[in-house]
Amino acid sequence: MEAQELGSPTPTYHLLPKANQHTVKEDAGSPSQGSPETMQLKKEISLLNGVSLVVGNMIGSGIFVSPKGVLKYTASYGLSLIVWAIGGLFSVVGALCYAELGTTITKSGASYAYILEAFGGFIAFIRLWVSLLIVEPTSQAIIAITFANYIIKPSFPTCDPPYVACRLLAAACVCLLTFVNCAYVKWGTRVQDTFTYAKVLALIAIIIMGLVKLCQGHTEHFQDAFKGSSWNVGDLSLALYSALFSYSGWDTLNFVTEEIKNPERNLPLAIGISMPIVTLIYILTNVAYYTVLNIQDVHKSDAVAVTFADQTFGMFSWTIPIAVALSCFGGLNASIFASSRLFFVGSREGHLPNLLSMIHIERFTPVPALLFNCTMTLIYLVVKDVFLLINYFSFSYWFFVGLSVVGQLYLRWKEPDWPRPLKLSLFFPIVFCVCSLFLVAVPLFSDTINSLIGIGIALSGVPVYFLGVYLPESRRPLFIRNVLATVTRVTQKLCFCVLTELDVTEEKNVERKTD
């Protein structure tokens, strides 16, 4: 079936071949023939958009809820604030390492792209498999459910919100944000900018209220700030995990490196601006919480920010639950934006079906990857105990993040002459690797069963890799090839999408990338 069926003017776009065909026709609108625009994702993310993406993804629901977990395991205000500071410092070091990686390997995909470059396709595929199967859809489903709970809860003050209503609202939220990101990249970044400003303003309001209370002489909670502190290594590690949950998202911009304007400058600069802002906001917000709430209040609270507002905001206390919901909405938008690019890059490298590396011919958005991400998240919304699934990937997450930085050290040795616009002292990646090793080891001892389940999920990708990637396409069952070809062609026509110019001109044979 020829591309003329799409009815598009020059440049002409061709559909993928059927399974029994062996070539992909060239794009008649290639740069050599003077096409007005190349079929690639556009560089539309400015420095301000980048800061909003990082800040918006980091400030999700965690800072409104996680103080309870940190204080539970530290048992004192002083030690709790130290843990928050350590979590921020650790995240800054990790973000700096990723800034070097992102300016050296200017591909989207974050740790997937870096592991692929350093260690090859097999380990990179396992990283992609874990993200596809558990990490991204589970985290997005949880954020969407949290958003729905905070929106519906005011209507049911004396009981839990209806299960079905929460899940339907969560699904509507996911679908709406998917549509926004399919429509235009600018729509997604504008939504992100708006909701980032809203959540930062909400936290500033909490900080100001806390400072007012301090100035009024409410310092009793800090007079013996370390009294009752728990110095048990296991408790401290669990407290750090709770803090790091709130700091997660510092690698968001590395998922979309190819869409950043002047990434050699703006990627490290956006990270350098975002990380101090978030760390300072988190520490000051906790100071505000601890000024007003005693330890028992924090322990009994399901959402510390809401309890704080009830005691300080008076008739305006309703604004904080709304702020939490808006924070979740913005965080979900950033997660959808980033994870769709991960699947896009994975497909472009031959680790996922070709259809996921297509973009809309007019809007230049990865519509199939966004729809795939949406579908996976909706599936997990059906799972009643979806919150339990988050326990399965703590081990895998820190393993692959740490492995990315090990790859940074390896590439320093293997490819010393590569241009590196940002080159850190080796002190930073070495410290981060050591700390990541600790974060990988702790769950193995403190939460062995869930960690082993997480390892099992990762290893389930091994046969998938050998059957779907390593095995030559000609040796795969004809039935599967025909199904994939049909689904790809139908998706291409329904979504009005084509392969990017990189796929068409440099990978004409659509070869699978292997080691």
From Swiss-Prot:
GO CC term (a single one): plasma membrane
Which residue ranges are assigned to the Extracellular compartment in the record's topology? 66-78, 136-167, 216-235, 288-311, 385, 446-451
Q: How does it sit in the membrane?
A: Multi-pass membrane protein
Task: Give the location in the cell.
Answer: Cell membrane
Gene Ontology terms, MF aspect: arginine binding; L-arginine transmembrane transporter activity; L-lysine:L-arginine antiporter activity
Entry's InterPro entries?
A: AA/rel_permease1 (IPR002293), AminoAcid_Transporter (IPR050598)
Name the residues that span the membrane.
45-65, 79-99, 115-135, 168-188, 195-215, 236-256, 267-287, 312-332, 364-384, 386-406, 425-445, 452-472
Q: Which GO terms describe its biological process?
A: glycine betaine transport; L-arginine transmembrane transport; L-leucine transport; neutral amino acid transport; nitric oxide biosynthetic process; ornithine transport
The tissues where this chain's protein is expressed are given as: Strongest expression in brain but also detected in testis, parotis, small intestine, heart and kidney. Weakly expressed in spleen, lung and liver.
Catalytic activity reported: L-lysine(out) + L-arginine(in) = L-lysine(in) + L-arginine(out); L-leucine(out) + L-arginine(in) + Na(+)(out) = L-leucine(in) + L-arginine(out) + Na(+)(in); L-glutamine(out) + L-arginine(in) + Na(+)(out) = L-glutamine(in) + L-arginine(out) + Na(+)(in); L-histidine(out) + L-arginine(in) + Na(+)(out) = L-histidine(in) + L-arginine(out) + Na(+)(in)
Which UniProt keywords are listed?
Amino-acid transport, Antiport, Cell membrane, Disulfide bond, Membrane, Phosphoprotein, Transmembrane, Transmembrane helix, Transport
Q: Which residues lie on this side of the membrane: Cytoplasmic?
A: 1-44, 100-114, 189-194, 257-266, 333-363, 407-424, 473-515
Q: What Gene3D superfamilies would the database entry show? A: Amino acid/polyamine transporter I
Phosphoserine occurs at S30
Q: Which purpose does this protein serve, as stated in its record?
A: Heterodimer with SLC3A2, that functions as an antiporter which operates as an efflux route by exporting cationic amino acids such as L-arginine from inside the cells in exchange with neutral amino acids like L-leucine, L-glutamine and isoleucine, plus sodium ions and may participate in nitric oxide synthesis. Also exchanges L-arginine with L-lysine in a sodium-independent manner. The transport mechanism is electroneutral and operates with a stoichiometry of 1:1.
Q: Which family does it belong to?
A: Belongs to the amino acid-polyamine-organocation (APC) superfamily. L-type amino acid transporter (LAT) (TC 2.A.3.8) family.
| Quaternary state and interactors | Disulfide-linked heterodimer with the amino acid transport protein SLC3A2/4F2hc.
- Protein's UniProt name: Y+L amino acid transporter 2
Annotated source species: Mus musculus
